[in-house]
Amino acid sequence: RYVCMIIPSRWMAGGRGVGDFEGFRQRMLGDHGTRELVDFPVASEVFPGVEVKGGICYFLWDGMYNGKARVRTIRGDEQQVALRNLDEFDVFVRDQRAVDILHKVLAKKEQSITTILTNKEPFKFETNFKDHHPKQRDRDVPIYLIASGKRTSAWVKTDLVEKNTHLIKTWKVLVPQAYGAGETTPHQILGKPIIAPSPSVCTGSFMFFHVKLKREAESVQSYYATKFFRFLVSLRKITQLAQRSVYTW
């Protein structure tokens, strides 16, 4: 009748790969048999000296129960307690205080920023792509990449671009696909963006928002840096991974 387990919390919103946590998350959120869910965003508060990206949680499932879960979120001396429907969203929003704000945002029914955001490896160049050179040659295009842990740019033959060729001639706001771990607060949530003029491409170290004009790119960059934008992202980004899905609301 009862199941009690302690597990990493990254199932709530994140996890590498689509299939790794998606099925488990859907089952956990859709099954109303969870009586108690206790979440520790900072795993070291449960296991001192141990780092678990996204935190630790434990839950009590009751096969005879069908109702709301009593959710406790514990971070240091602060504790939030609420009775909640776990399936209110497609991911579990850990901070109860954020739910009211999120409802107001969703009520606007505005178009998601993901409509101008690419997926990973937008030009099919992997993060370790090497077929580039430091000086411009005929039919080259600038390529933005990370080499030896540093952001830099080089040149690559336009003919090597096999994917999203229509996006070469767009202004881009490049954003890293991983940043931080999300355990301690306050923190930036997202890495620093780069504006890449048209024409340009990038390796798989980046995704990008694509627009037509420089001023639009500057507007996206400015919005990306706001606390409001990062707050919304933080509701889905609970590990270091910053995949396209974390920008979805």
PLM region descriptions:
Residues 44-203, 209-249:
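C-terminal substrate-recognition regions of SAM-dependent nucleic acid methyltransferases
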Residues 1-45, 58, 220:
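Conserved Class I SAM-dependent methyltransferase catalytic core
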